[in-house]
A protein has these predicted regions:
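N-terminal low-complexity, Pro/Thr-rich disordered segments
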Residues: 32-49, 62-78, 147-164, 248-288, ...
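Acidic/charged, solvent-exposed loop-and-adjacent secondary-structure segments enriched in E/D, K/R, S/T
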Residues: 132-156
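N-terminal mature ectodomain segment of secretory-pathway/periplasmic proteins
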Residues: 2-5, 21-135, 173, 187, ...
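N-terminal export and membrane-targeting signals
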Residues: 1-14
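A generic structural motif
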Residues: 142-143, 191, 220, 262, ...
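Hydrophobic, proline/glycine-rich low-complexity stretches
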Residues: 14-21
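Accessory, solvent-exposed terminal regions and/or long lumenal/extracellular loops of proteins
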Residues: 244-344, 348-359
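Gly/Pro-enriched, hydrophobic low-complexity segments
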Residues: 109, 177-252
Length: 360
């Protein structure tokens, strides 16, 4: 595994935090809410004000998911080494520099052990760069056409719909004042009503002046330290230097190019979901069962090609997972994953027992 894999590993906790709170992030707009006693809906509505924000900052991500540790040694297989890298990336703390100039210019920069990895977006051009491996990827994004939104048209309407969508399964707290990276923020706490989820609470801190989300914290039940926390430790508003969003691969770098600008490529992508051996590729879309915080995602049979794992991976699976009825599973403090004997994959913020029951 190339070290550029830090990118999904760092982003994964952000996705977790964002996914469980996604209903709260409505496409809304509002005036700054500093100096008031706002409702949760008003704080939610203010988030859209940050869509055009310009800022530079330092972002810190920490995870305490209770993932198993793999023994290291010279005799380990390459797959075991890859898994060790992934686990290290998921469990260790990471600090990244973030530069944002509106919705179409962003740069995330991670520097560690004299190496640098970057994700750079400038309009439709996206680059990733790994200085240690000297590899770069250039992706051309499709041009997005503006799509009018149906339904609610005012911030108040949209915010009300967002709150109404989650209140059946979630208790939403009254905003409280906190300070993050030197900025005053409103913090909202979301608490699942269901007892079957591993999620204890989700806390979102939102800048009082700009609506920019400054910190997201996901707490697991029965655990004192946050399972996932992503937040700014320093933040300065203002347009970053334009040169930060320009990138030219150094001489001798290995460059991979992917052009997604043609809308017709989606058809090819759908076809690629099916392999010639009948199994499903990673792009196969999941189905969902359950509701709210107890939702379970399932990828179909053939998603995991177990025959390709072979003897080399058997020891790896044994260390990462435990044997359960009908397959193997791993449960972290926040998320469980179940690999069935027929190659299905089930995952959710629920105990393994719930996944096993859903698979039957």
């Amino acid at each position: 595994m190339k070290k550029s894999a830090w990118l999904p590993a760092v982003i994964a906790p952000v996705v977790v935090a964002g996914a469980v709170a996604a209903p709260m992030i409505a496409n809304a707009a509002n005036d700054p809410i500093a100096g008031k006693n706002p409702s949760a809906a008003a704080v939610i509505a203010s988030i859209a004000e940050s869509s055009d924000a310009q800022y530079s900052g330092k972002l810190e991500q920490t995870s305490d998911l209770g993932l198993p540790e793999l023994p290291t040694g010279s005799g380990g297989s390459s797959l075991e080494g890859d898994a060790s890298d992934v686990l290290s990336l998921l469990t260790a703390s990471h600090t990244a520099r973030v530069y944002v100039d509106g919705p179409s210019k962003q740069r995330v920069q991670l520097t560690q052990q004299l190496a640098e990895q970057d994700l750079i977006r400038n309009g439709s051009d996206v680059w990733t760069w790994d200085s240690k491996e000297r590899t770069a990827t250039h992706v051309t994004l499709p041009k997005e056409a503006a799509t009018p939104q149906d339904g609610a048209t005012t911030p108040a309407d949209i915010a009300k719909q967002a709150v109404d969508a989650i209140t059946p399964s979630t208790t939403v707290s009254k905003p409280t004042e906190v300070r993050v990276a030197g900025h005053d923020a409103w913090q909202i706490t979301l608490t699942p009503k269901a007892s079957g989820t591993l999620v204890g609470t989700v806390r979102l801190a939102i800048d009082q002046q700009t609506g920019l989300p400054l910190r997201a914290t996901v707490d697991a039940k029965g655990q004192d330290d946050p399972a996932v926390q992503v937040g700014f430790t320093s933040l300065s508003y203002g347009a970053p230097a334009a040169r930060l969003f320009d990138f030219t691969p150094p001489t001798g770098a290995k460059v991979e190019t992917k052009d997604l600008s043609d809308a017709g490529s989606h058809a090819k992508g759908d076809a690629d979901h099916h392999r010639t051996d009948g199994s499903r590729a990673a792009g196969a879309e999941p189905t969902f069962t359950g509701k709210g915080w107890s939702t379970i995602a399932e990828l179909p049979a053939g998603t995991v090609d177990q025959s390709s794992l072979g003897d080399e991976a058997s020891g790896l699976l044994g260390q990462l997972t435990k044997s359960v009825d009908g397959g193997r599973a791993v449960q972290t403090s926040l998320v469980s994953v179940y690999l069935t004997d027929d190659g299905r994959v089930l995952a959710g913020a629920v105990p393994v027992s719930a996944l096993v029951a859903a698979a039957k």
